[in-house]
């Protein structure tokens, strides 16, 4: 199983980068993880609704052109469906059984995702009703993926 994490923008905070690096290292025995960052679009000050949509569309185009063919696409969005850690593990197992060798998670930028990206997703996932920074959600996603693979393998970590 190959996991792709596609995200808008670069991580600037050292503490988040350290956490991401740690979970990427922990995931190596279980799966290959590729993190693909696309440039974020400059947001005009006092941006209008139309300008906001334009930013999301441009970022969305950059994301979508990097999605591998035949990949199962999970889009992270606050309006998506919640899932437990056990549910994520089961979903990954089920996707493997269905013949998927590639899962792509898409994380939007500061303004979220375009409707086109949301429509492209095979599943829209919400980690919480709360809003997190797009940088923080990358770390949370990696931790949940690590937890999911530990659950799948029946190894201690998940309580």
Swiss-Prot record:
Its EC number is 2.1.1.177. GO terms for molecular function: rRNA (pseudouridine-N3-)-methyltransferase activity. Gene3D superfamilies: 3.40.1280.10. It is an enzyme of class 2 (transferase). The keyword Nuclease does not apply. It comes from the Bacteria. This is Ribosomal RNA large subunit methyltransferase H. It holds the Pfam family SPOUT_MTase. Specifically methylates the pseudouridine at position 1915 (m3Psi1915) in 23S rRNA. Homodimer. It catalyses: pseudouridine(1915) in 23S rRNA + S-adenosyl-L-methionine = N(3)-methylpseudouridine(1915) in 23S rRNA + S-adenosyl-L-homocysteine + H(+).
């Amino acid at each position: 199983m190959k996991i792709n994490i596609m995200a808008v923008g670069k991580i600037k905070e050292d503490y988040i980068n350290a956490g991401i690096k740690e979970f990427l290292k922990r995931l190596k025995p279980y799966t290959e993880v590729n993190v693909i960052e696309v440039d974020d679009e400059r947001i005009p000050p006092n941006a209008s609704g139309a300008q906001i949509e334009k930013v999301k569309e441009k970022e969305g185009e950059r994301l979508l052109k990097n999605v591998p063919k035949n990949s199962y696409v999970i889009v992270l969005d606050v309006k998506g469906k919640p899932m437990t850690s056990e549910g994520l593990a089961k979903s990954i197992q089920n996707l493997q059984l269905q013949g998927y060798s590639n899962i792509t998670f898409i994380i939007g930028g500061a303004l979220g995702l375009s409707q086109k990206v949301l429509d492209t997703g095979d599943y829209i996932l919400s980690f919480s009703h709360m809003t997190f920074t797009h940088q923080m959600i990358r770390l949370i996603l990696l931790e949940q993926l690590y937890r999911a693979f530990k659950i799948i393998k029946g190894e201690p970590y998940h309580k």
